[in-house]
Regions:
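Active-site/acyl-donor-binding loops of N-acyltransferases
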Residues: 182-241, 245, 253
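Non-catalytic substrate-recognition and accessory regions of acyl/acetyltransferase enzymes
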Residues: 1-149, 235-262
Length: 262
C-alpha cells in the first residue's frame, strides 16, 4: 500500500537503513514488516507502523557522524557512561544497533570489563512510543557474580539498573508511552529462559492487549519514608547512584544526538 511505498523510499534514502543493510546479520528495514519483529502475534500493518516510526526516530535523532559508531558490532557500539562500583571498578554502558533487530533497533548494554552483564532491546518511534522486545542477562556471568555485583551497587540488581538506564534514555527523548513484550509472545519465545512478566509487574507494568505490558511513563521510586531506618543510608546511596547515572547518560546522549528545539 501507500504507506509501505513511502517507507520503502525512506529505506532507500536514510543513512540508518543503509547502515543496517550493510551490517552483517541485521534484518533490513525493508523486510521488517514481513519478518519476526517485536511480537510474534503482530500484524504486518502494526509492524510497518512501528518500523516506520523507528526508522524516523533513528535517522532524525542521532548525528550523522555518530550513527556509524552505533553499527560498529565489533566494539559493541558506542560507549556512553561508566557507573562506578564500591570496589573502584565500573560498569560500562554502551548503545548499539541491536544485533537482534527482531527485538528492536536499539540495544543498551552493561559490561563489566569485557563481559556483558545485561542488555535490553527496544524500538523507539518518532511519535513518542517505545516497544521493548527483549531483555537478557550475560551468559558469562553466573548468579554468584550477580549477587556480588548487586552488593557493589548498594543493592541494585543489574536487571533493575538496566531498566533505570532505559528510563533515563526514554525520558531524554520525552518518550512516555512504553510497552514491553510478554515472554510468551517474544519472537523466539521457545528460547526465552525467564518470565518477563514478573519483571514488568514488579516495575509497575500492567497487562495490556495482545502480549504487551504497558509500563509506567517514568520509573516508580520508593520514598525514603517507606524504607526502614537501618536501610536508609544504603537506600540514599542507591538512589544517588541511579540519579547520577541518568544525568551522565543524558549528557552522553547530548553528545551524539542532533540538537532538538525546546
Amino acid at each position: 500500500g501507500g504507506k509501505y511505498k513511502e517507507y520503502q523510499t525512506l529505506c532507500e534514502n536514510y543513512a540508518c537503513a543503509k547502515l543496517t543493510g550493510a551490517t552483517e546479520g541485521l534484518v533490513n528495514f525493508e523486510d521488517k514488516p514481513f519478518k519476526a519483529y517485536l511480537n510474534k502475534k503482530m500484524s504486518k500493518r502494526a509492524k510497518l507502523n512501528i518500523a516506520h516510526g523507528a526508522l524516523n526516530f533513528i535517522e532524525k535523532t542521532f548525528r550523522p557522524e555518530a550513527l556509524p559508531q552505533l553499527y560498529d558490532m565489533a566494539a559493541f557500539g558506542r560507549s556512553l557512561i561508566a557507573i562506578p562500583l564500591k570496589n573502584g571498578t565500573c560498569i560500562d554502558v554502551k548503545l548499539l544497533a541491536s544485533p537482534f533487530q527482531e527485538e528492536g533497533e536499539l540495544m543498551l548494554l552493561m559490561f563489566l570489563g569485557d563481559r556483558r552483564v545485561y542488555s535490553i532491546c527496544f524500538s523507539c518511534t518518532a511519535d513518542g512510543q517505545a516497544w521493548i522486545g527483549g531483555i537478557q542477562g550475560g551468559k558469562d556471568i553466573d548468579n554468584e557474580e550477580v549477587k556480588a555485583l548487586t552488593k557493589e551497587l548498594y543493592g541494585i540488581r543489574p536487571k533493575n539498573l538496566i531498566i533505570t538506564l532505559l528510563y533515563g534514555f526514554l525520558s531524554h527523548f520525552n518518550i512516555k508511552e512504553i510497552y514491553a513484550i510478554d515472554s510468551h509472545y517474544h519472537v523466539k519465545s521457545e528460547r526465552v529462559k525467564t518470565s518477563y512478566s514478573e519483571l514488568w509487574l514488579e516495575i509497575g507494568g500492567e497487562k495490556h492487549r495482545r502480549g504487551w505490558y504497558k509500563l509506567p511513563p517514568s520509573e516508580i521510586k520508593k520514598s525514603l519514608e517507606e524504607v526502614k531506618s537501618k536501610h536508609r543510608s544504603q537506600f540514599i546511596k542507591r538512589e544517588g547512584l541511579k540519579e547520577l547515572a541518568q544525568l551522565d547518560l543524558a549528557a552522553a546522549l547530548r553528545d551524539i544526538c542532533v540538537k532538538r528545539n525546546g
